[in-house]
Every structure is written in structure tokens, then in C-alpha cells.
Design a protein with these regions (language model features):
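Short catalytic-loop micro-motif centered on adjacent basic/acidic residues
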Residues: 1-2, 25-27, 120-123
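Conserved AMP-binding
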Residues: 3-8, 125-127
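Conserved AMP-binding/adenylation subdomain of ANL enzymes
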Residues: 6-104, 117, 142
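Conserved AMP-binding/adenylate-forming
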Residues: 46, 102-146
């Protein structure tokens, strides 16, 4: 799935790779319709520049900040446990159980908003802020620096 113009140097390079490996390429109608287009295309990989992921980070955080009570605690646990897993830290039994809840109640819902099949976001054309990459991975959106 892509939304960058074909004239963009990163997108141009990625297009060649996609052609070489025989991948299907879906083009979003516009940046505003990207998420709804992802629901239709159900992409497995999406490439974009760091600015896209910064905006996504901001929007997800704005949504998280609106939550309160149990939802807010579950979101915080999702982030904390996701970061521990990313750093390959051992989870206690209680954390493993909570993480299962986070997977079903938070991460799965987030992944479904992006079509449900997303295997990886790939950021390229510049450096992705490490905190943004960690955050996206922690909430269930595997993000790689290309």
C-alpha cells in the first residue's frame, strides 16, 4: 500500500523492488482516505517516509489520551509490555496474562484498522525516530527502518 507520489525518490525506488518481486501495489486515493483504503486493500507491507509515522504516532496518542479508567490502564500496559517484548525482556507470568489481554483488546483492534493483514510498516527516505518505532511496535504495528 502506498500513498506517496511516484515522483518521490523513496517511492520510486520501492516501486522497482515491488515490480522485481512481483508484489501487488495498491495506491491510496488520498492521504485522508488512506486508512479506509487499507481496510479494502488489506496490505501486508506498507512503505512510507518517517513523517507519515510521526503523524500516525501523534494521532494514535491523541486517541489514547482521550481514554480513561480501565481503558487507559490497558493502553498503558500494552505500551509497557510491548516495549519489554521488543527489548527481549522476560515477562513474569502475570505480565504474560495481561499481555494476552492487551493483544486481544488493544493490539488486534489497532491492526484491524489497518486491514488486519499488516506484517510490517517499512520506513525509509530518512531516519525514523526510535521512540516512534518502539511505540508502533509496542501497539502491534510492526515497524522497520528501511
Amino acid at each position: 500500500m502506498t500513498w506517496l507520489p511516484l515522483s518521490h525518490s523513496y517511492e520510486h525506488t520501492v516501486q522497482f523492488i515491488q515490480i522485481i518481486v512481483g508484489a501487488k501495489v495498491f495506491y491510496a486515493e488520498s492521504l485522508e482516505k488512506l486508512i479506509s483504503n487499507m481496510g479494502v486493500a488489506k496490505p501486508t507491507i506498507m512503505t512510507a517516509v518517517p513523517r507519515f509515522y510521526q503523524n500516525l504516532f501523534t494521532k494514535i496518542n491523541m486517541n489514547f489520551e482521550k481514554q480513561s479508567g480501565l481503558k487507559r490502564k490497558l493502553i498503558n500496559q500494552t505500551l509497557n509490555l510491548g516495549k519489554k517484548i521488543l527489548k527481549k525482556e522476560e515477562l513474569k507470568l502475570s505480565e504474560k496474562i495481561i499481555n494476552l489481554l492487551c493483544e486481544k483488546l488493544v493490539r488486534k483492534k489497532i491492526r484491524n484498522q489497518f486491514g488486519g493483514n499488516l506484517q510490517a510498516f517499512v520506513s525509509g527516505g530518512g531516519a525514523l525516530d526510535q521512540n516512534i518505532g518502539e511505540f508502533l511496535n509496542a501497539v502491534g504495528l510492526p515497524t522497520l527502518q528501511g
